[in-house]
Amino acid sequence: MLEFFELLLKNKFISNIWRYVLEMIDQNISDDLLDKQQLMNLFTIYFSLIDDGNTTISLDEKVLKSKWQKKIEAVSEMLMQHEEIDLSQIDQIKQMSNICIDQQYLSKINEDDLSSVVGSNKIFVVSNQWLYLRKYDSAKRKIAKAIGRLFTKEYNNSIDFDYRKCTKDDFDLSKKQQEVVKKGINKNLIITGGPGTGKTTCVLFLLIALLENSDKNYNIYLVAPSGKAASRMKESISSTLDCVSEKYKKQNRKLFSIIDNLQQFTIHRLLEVDSKTSRFNYNEKHQFSSNSIFIIDEASMIDICLFSSLLESIQDDSRVFIMGDKNQLPSVESGAVFSALLDSKMLIKNGNIIELDESRRFSKDTEIYALASAINKGEQLVMAKDKWQDYKQFKIEKTDRKKCPIFYYQYVNSVSENKEIINYICNIWANEYYRELVKKATGINLDDKKRLDELYEMSLQGKILSAENLGYCGSRSINNFIKNMCVDKSVSTDVLYQYPGQIMMINTNNKVLDLYNGDNGIIVTLENSSIAYFMVKKSSLIQTEDGYRENRIFKIGEYLFYPLRLISQDEIDLAYAITIHKSQGSDYNNILVVLPNRIGHPLLNRQIIYTAITRTKGNTYILANQELLQKGCDNRLIRDCNIFQ
């Protein structure tokens, strides 16, 4: 019964985690059922599409065939790029798919014909001719219910707040930012906007308005899907406080003490995972107090199940402000919840959605602004042929970073030459941005605070962003190349194969160590010591007092030092290059964007290109070619999740 699954697995159409589920379904469906094989193949297609982030599939033959055909084309292109394609097997997949994706079989996926696996308490649920795993159907219903109860309420606060009374003379909010403050006093809001549009800025002034004019003792939670994104939100709020006048701060010491001491949370840390049951301690039955304010950032990164868990833990009278960029990539896991919220007719009608469209990071005369705007509108990219340079002309440009220029370098048609191109460019990049890190990170003096700051800033000067993790265009291959080129292997540490100067990123939430997915830092050694430490800039609950502690976690200023041996080596990765997904919520002074080099690749799409280029604060280098870039911009990633249907 799993022949089709094995074929898809061999050709990278599906992940192996579905094997057990399909075996369980096979056991639950009677062998006497005439069409069992075709139904099993349909369920296999569904799981394959879940791997792409969908939560549901249509039981309409025409719609499903169109969706599946796009996946076949995309995976085939990816296999060609990696030189792993077997055309005869792709043809076999097409033939088997054409047989099972037929209305006569699709119409049998219902509670009557398949009562053993379809129904309210079974593996699958069918709703309005769409098939869901029960957990996704449950999550979408909980989200719709929570949005209904949290975003239809009006708060009758008769507050007349003028932000100008608390800011310095040279500070202004845009009209849309002022609308956020004014509306947010009496409504919960969804706020969308690109980088530099001031989402966090206007929410800070909204917070000031609510705290200044209320006798409620609010519990305020800064929440994001990753540790990095949560830290960035706290940093953004702290930096925006510089716009507030000292006079106003002195008049409202208690208010600003609250804001200064706000804590940031990943969603997992906020909801508290029970170590025994692996379930969240905060949930529908045990909610946060109603005098709570939730500021949720990078919402596009939150998957459907996590979004559901977060919203159901919030009481009706709570204040909720959800922020994100509608044009960024959706979550790594299934769903596209933030996008669905922005399309909600109820939220639009009720005035809960505000889009900020004035960027203070990218002025309208910059190349980045023009390219990002064209990408989002799906426009034809107009650029002169001489814009695309040969890779041998690659160099680190010494230009005015405020102009955010873009430099384009092109692939050729040969795979072997493209590998050489990537290595050639990464060699120059590493010499500029990573080689000096090795000296700076070896034998550091903890009393030299300036050196710590310089080291951390150096690690952020240049970042390589890749669409994929595997393959010669992928972050893993690039990271290994740069490590072998840069590290000094004569400097041994107490952790095998780990050396000072390596840029690293945490890939798993670790509550015990207070390290979270997305936390990034550098491996360092101290004077006269071979102990390797992971140095990361973050606040932490587990170590709040300054001072060196031998062989233990310690804090110096804004930096935490973790003995690297405390961190499981499968929980931390090299991060000279990271995937574009991982880069969400971050920005870097200079970026090198390495795109897939085949048209039709599943990771060559509008959202991934937009997300990548908007991580820059300065120079952007793109490795692709004109046709690849245009085709990627034309390909908009669409996920089926049907939250409000």
Regions found by a protein language model. Give the residues of each.
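Intrinsically disordered, low-complexity N-terminal extensions of AAA+/P-loop NTPases
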Residues: 1-82
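Pre-Walker A segment
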Residues: 125-195, 204, 210
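ASCE P-loop NTPase helicase motor core
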Residues: 178-181, 186-399
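Residue-level recognition of short, solvent-exposed, well-ordered loop/turn junctions
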Residues: 289, 315, 496-500, 516, ...
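Conserved helicase motor core of P-loop NTPases
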Residues: 327, 331-504, 510-513
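C-terminal accessory regions
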Residues: 519-645
